[in-house]
Design a protein with these regions (language model features):
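Residue signature of alpha-solenoid helical repeat architecture, marking inter-repeat boundaries
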Residues: 24, 61-63, 102, 142, ...
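N-terminal leader/linker segments that initiate helical-solenoid repeat arrays
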Residues: 21-69, 78-82
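Amphipathic alpha-helical segments of tetratricopeptide repeats
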Residues: 50-54, 89-94, 130-136, 170-174, ...
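Conserved alpha-helical positions within TPR/SEL1-like repeat arrays
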Residues: 68, 75, 106-117, 142-157, ...
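Hydrophobic positions within repeat-based interaction scaffolds
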Residues: 28-32, 36, 43, 85, ...
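Structural motif corresponding to the intra-repeat A-B loop/turn of tetratricopeptide repeats
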Residues: 77-78, 118, 158, 178, ...
Length: 377
């Protein structure tokens, strides 16, 4: 090889190294900008992440940071269907190996959320507990509060309400340390719901009232606390107060789906006190709700009203509509169960095939060794 060719190769290698360093620096800048805008502008964070030309080319910390930030951005933009446990595991494994407790704790938290989406509840709980253990020695109180909040949700889903109440208390303590007003309100609402679930109406009302006082400064929360207070009043047969709470909740609510839920609750109280026309108006207004359970509930209560009035034909028709909506939900759940079974079958089949291939390879290797080995002297 002549000197000119050697110089050309060296120059090319230097150029490639330079371009690589420049690209690495650009990716670092993008990841830093993503981290800075994640909380307030998650849509911008997701858009910035798309500027990284070759995510699969990232290595080490850049790769882990990208995996964590993309999982966060998808979560905050409600793109649950795009979440991947293999993606967030890149971050989990890297940060844990490097001893970065803060980022490892965050990664475990988001891994838990992905497991929750997949309804793998025990895996989610294990991830949250691991996150809590790692974050204990950090000062990221907000994420610690979120971890305990989700542990509370998991316990609540399983009917362990007393445990969930204790978890939610932990979350409030951390949110107070983080001075996060919005999440403190979430904590109060969780506590109120938890106590309401175990029929401790006094405690439920105390937290709901406490949240209501603070809720004016946080959009969307006031209606939620008013609805909770309405449920408590209705449970205690304080119907005039329940009607007032539900009506006020609907008045201040700016979310259409929530407004339908509040209208359904209001209709039930009107039905209890014999104001049938008002009850019917509330139920009819909920028929077009996008939430199948709300619209099905509206048809169910209309059927019940007409049955009590002796109008059995109308009652039957409304009951049919209620049942058909629930059947759609059941079919969707059944399809999911069948798909899960099919995926499990395919995975088991693949594992079996791999085992067979491995055994066949081992047999071939054995026979090769048998026929090529020298005979004993």
């Amino acid at each position: 090889m002549n000197a000119g060719m050697k110089n050309g190769i060296n120059l090319l290698m230097i150029l490639v190294l330079f371009i690589s360093c420049v690209q690495e620096k650009e990716d670092d800048n993008v990841l830093s900008r993503v981290e800075a805008c994640m909380e307030l502008f998650p849509d911008s964070a997701l858009s910035l992440l798309s500027q990284i030309d070759c995510p699969e080319c990232l290595r080490g910390q850049q790769r882990a940071d990208y995996a964590l930030l993309l999982t966060q951005a998808l979560d905050k933009n409600y793109l649950d269907s795009l979440q991947s446990d293999s993606l967030i595991m890149i971050a989990v494994e890297y940060y844990k190996q490097e001893g970065d407790k803060l980022k490892a704790g965050k990664a475990y938290f988001y891994y838990g959320k992905v497991m929750l989406l997949k309804e793998r509840f025990s895996d989610a709980m294990q991830a949250y507990l691991e996150a809590s253990s790692l974050l204990e020695e950090t000062r990221d109180y907000k994420v610690q509060g979120m971890v305990w909040e989700y542990i509370g949700y998991l316990n609540s889903v399983q009917g362990l309400y007393e445990n969930s109440i204790d978890n939610f208390k932990h979350s409030i303590r951390y949110y107070e340390l983080a001075s996060d007003r919005r999440r403190i309100l979430y904590g109060y609402r969780n506590m109120a719901r938890g106590y309401f679930s175990v029929h401790h109406n006094d405690s439920a009302g105390w937290y709901a009232e406490k949240g209501l006082v603070l809720s004016d400064t946080v959009s969307g929360m006031k209606a939620s606390f008013l609805h909770l207070l309405g449920l408590i009043a209705n449970n205690e047969k304080r119907y005039p107060q329940a009607i007032e709470y539900f009506s006020n909740a609907m008045e201040v609510c700016d979310n259409l789906n929530d407004k339908y839920r509040y209208s359904l609750s209001l209709g039930r109280v009107y039905s209890e006190v014999g104001q049938k026309k008002k009850a019917e108006d509330c139920f009819v207004s909920c028929i077009n709700a996008t939430n199948i359970f709300v619209s099905s509930g509206a048809y169910y209560y209309l059927a019940d009203m007409h049955k009590k009035d002796g109008n059995y034909l109308k009652a039957f028709l409304y009951k049919e509509k209620s049942d058909s909506l629930l059947e759609v939900t059941r079919n969707a759940e059944l399809q999911k169960q069948l798909l899960d079974l099919q995926n499990k079958y395919e995975n088991d089949k693949l594992i079996l095939e791999n085992k067979q291939i491995r055994l066949e390879n081992e047999k071939q290797t054995y026979f090769c060794l048998l026929y090529t080995s020298p005979s004993p002297r």
